[in-house]
């Protein structure tokens, strides 16, 4: 089973944009940070632009957030890159001749819907600024530890 890392990669992109507002930031340099290719980064950035979460001008390596980081939620970012795709997916290729196989989807769907609702509510409470603040706290702690050693 392959898991999507689009959300974490897109948050990575947005944090880089937010903390590098004064610096040039090309899709190639962002891709290097994520260990991916610039084309993938451009696809993510295009989705962010369509969702009106970031702005950029073609040919200029200066993307920017379209609104303050404390007004962008993790749910906004998730919806921008994943659309209405649910977090959990049912296996619809089960054996129709098996009692469990034929009924498991309906049995699980109610629980998956609850999980989706709860996750979206929590994601809507977490802002990009919260993530940036946590990033700065972690880098500060790491720098302090390196100074001690």
What do these predicted ranges mean?
Residues 18-22, 67-68:
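Short helix-capping/hinge SLiMs at alpha-helix to coil transitions
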Residues 51-66:
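Beta-hairpin "wing" of winged helix-turn-helix
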Residues 69-94:
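Conserved segment of winged-helix/HTH DNA-binding domains
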Residues 45-49:
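Basic amphipathic alpha-helical segments that dock to polyanions
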Residues 28-34:
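A short alpha-helical element within helix-turn-helix/winged-helix DNA-binding domains
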Residues 92, 96-149:
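C-terminal regulatory/oligomerization modules of transcriptional regulators
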Residues 1-13:
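Short alpha-helical segments that sit at the start of domains
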